[in-house]
C-alpha cells in the first residue's frame, strides 16, 4: 500500500538547492537563457544541449536528472497547485508532487520522469509534458465539479 507524507524541512531545503543547481545548469548549457527566470523552455534547451554533449559519468548524470526533475516538479507545484510529498510503496520512497489527495490522486515523480527520458536520450519534452499534465489536472477538476 502506498503511503503519502508531507516533506520535511530538510527535504524542502534539498529541493531549493536543486532549483538553484538547475539555474546554474541552464546557465552552463543554454547561455542565452542565463540571467532570466528559470523556465521549462530553458530547461528543455539546456537538457538537449547536455544530452548532445554525450555525458557518461554516472554521478553527474544523476545530479543533472535531479536538477531538471526537481525544477519540473516545482513548475507543476507552482503552476497547478500540486504539493511536494514523499511517496512510499513496496519499492521505496521518493519525492513526488501530489494533487487532489483522496479525490483522484494525481501523483507525479518528476525526477523519475526525467530519468526515463534520459534513458531514451529524449529531449525537448518538458513543456509538452507540462501541457499534457495541465490538461489532465483540468479534466479531473472539471469531473470533481460535476459530481
Task: Set out the residue ranges of the language-model regions.
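Amphipathic protein-protein interaction modules
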Residues: 62-117
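Short secondary-structure junctions and interdomain/linker hinges
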Residues: 22, 29-33, 50-57, 75-78, ...
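N-terminal low-complexity, intrinsically disordered segments
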Residues: 1-62
Amino acid at each position: 500500500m502506498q503511503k503519502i507524507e508531507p516533506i520535511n524541512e530538510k527535504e524542502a531545503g534539498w529541493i531549493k538547492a536543486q532549483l538553484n543547481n538547475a539555474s546554474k545548469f541552464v546557465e552552463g548549457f543554454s547561455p542565452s537563457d542565463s540571467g532570466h527566470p528559470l523556465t521549462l523552455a530553458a530547461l528543455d534547451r539546456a537538457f538537449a544541449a547536455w544530452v548532445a554533449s554525450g555525458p557518461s559519468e554516472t554521478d553527474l548524470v544523476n545530479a543533472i536528472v535531479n536538477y531538471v526533475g526537481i525544477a519540473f516538479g516545482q513548475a507543476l507545484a507552482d503552476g497547478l497547485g500540486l504539493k511536494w510529498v514523499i511517496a512510499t510503496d513496496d519499492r521505496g520512497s521518493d519525492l513526488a508532487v501530489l494533487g487532489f489527495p483522496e479525490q483522484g490522486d494525481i501523483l507525479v515523480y518528476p525526477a523519475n520522469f526525467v530519468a526515463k527520458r534520459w534513458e531514451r536520450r529524449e529531449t525537448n519534452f518538458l513543456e509538452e509534458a507540462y501541457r499534457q499534465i495541465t490538461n489532465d489536472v483540468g479534466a479531473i477538476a472539471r469531473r470533481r465539479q460535476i459530481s
